[in-house]
Amino acid sequence: MQQAKAVARTVRIAPRKARLVMDLIRGKQVGEAVSILNHTPKAASPIIEKVLKSAIANAEHNYEMDANNLVVTQAYVNEGPTLKRFRPRAMGRASQINKRTSHITIVVSEKKEG
């Protein structure tokens, strides 16, 4: 069974927030997944939709798969490098602010007949 993959690395969204959206599309057909992402009011939705469309395009172009038969087989978010920033606080102190990034991976494959 052939698989097509798309990865977006070091995306400026917290992995915890991106996983909430990713859980909605895992195991779904790609058409259904795209419509779910269009109707999900989260900041991660357009980013994940772009990665999903890239995976679909990779499947069509590189492996000659039919887009109508594609299913999201794997969808996961890993933690990327953290950008560390500092916020000034009272009495000359400073608090560290972690700007988290994500590595978003989506794998699609053709669903089995039957």
Swiss-Prot record:
One of its GO terms (molecular function) is rRNA binding. Keywords: Ribonucleoprotein, Ribosomal protein, RNA-binding, rRNA-binding. GO terms for cellular component: cytosolic large ribosomal subunit. One of its GO terms (biological process) is translation. Pfam families: Ribosomal_L22 (PF00237). It comes from the Bacteria. The keyword Ribosomal protein applies. The keyword Cytoplasm does not apply. This protein binds specifically to 23S rRNA; its binding is stimulated by other ribosomal proteins, e.g. L4, L17, and L20. It is important during the early stages of 50S assembly. It makes multiple contacts with different domains of the 23S rRNA in the assembled 50S subunit and ribosome. The globular domain of the protein is located near the polypeptide exit tunnel on the outside of the subunit, while an extended beta-hairpin is found that lines the wall of the exit tunnel in the center of the 70S ribosome. Part of the 50S ribosomal subunit. Belongs to the universal ribosomal protein uL22 family. This is Large ribosomal subunit protein uL22. It comes from Bacillus licheniformis (strain ATCC 14580 / DSM 13 / JCM 2505 / CCUG 7422 / NBRC 12200 / NCIMB 9375 / NCTC 10341 / NRRL NRS-1264 / Gibson 46). The gene is rplV.
